[in-house]
Amino acid sequence: MAIYFLHSYGIIHRDLKPENILMTDLTLQADLKLLDFGLSKIIGNEEKCTEPYGTLSFVAPEVLESKPYDKSVDLWSIGIITFLLLCGYLPFDDKHSEKEIARQTVQDPVPYDKKIMSKYSPEAWIFVDGLLQKKPEKRYSIKEVLEHPWIKKMDKVPKERRDSKNDSKFGFYTSKME
């Protein structure tokens, strides 16, 4: 939902990775918070970026190819993060040189391991595959992500934005600042 919120305001994060996601506690019900907006940018609906920003193992192929890109690069990063969470390793080997990681990201197919895939539902892999499309126009949109059957199975996916009026904890802290 955080990416939906950002994208609905025209904000592209451009550096989504596990290090930039904070869990509010260690339970399965923990809220997730996005951090580090240093590379983020506000763009219009049809606007494209050209700056080569992001962390190599999580950056979309179009960024590595110096092509204009849009908010869909954040969705590629979500696909990489999801792959990492399911498999325990990055899809494009981070043990190689940076040049080799970039080449793999742009040219190689996603290396799905059938043994690992058998541990999860087919919907999980369809979800990951929809995010890790090399061509941005084939990649899932944020609306497709939120409507995906695997995501809809999750117990806790809030369907509305939070603000100081709807979130008592947030409201408490912001009211002290006013």
Residue ranges and their predicted role:
Residues H7-T24:
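Catalytic-loop of the protein kinase fold
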Residues T50-E62:
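Conserved activation segment of eukaryotic-like protein kinases, specifically the C-terminal portion
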Residues D74:
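Conserved catalytic-loop aspartate of Hanks-type protein kinases
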Residues C87-P91:
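Structural helix C-cap motif within protein kinase domains
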Residues K119-L132:
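Conserved C-terminal C-lobe helix
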Residues Q133-P158:
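Terminal C-lobe "cap" of eukaryotic-type protein kinase domains
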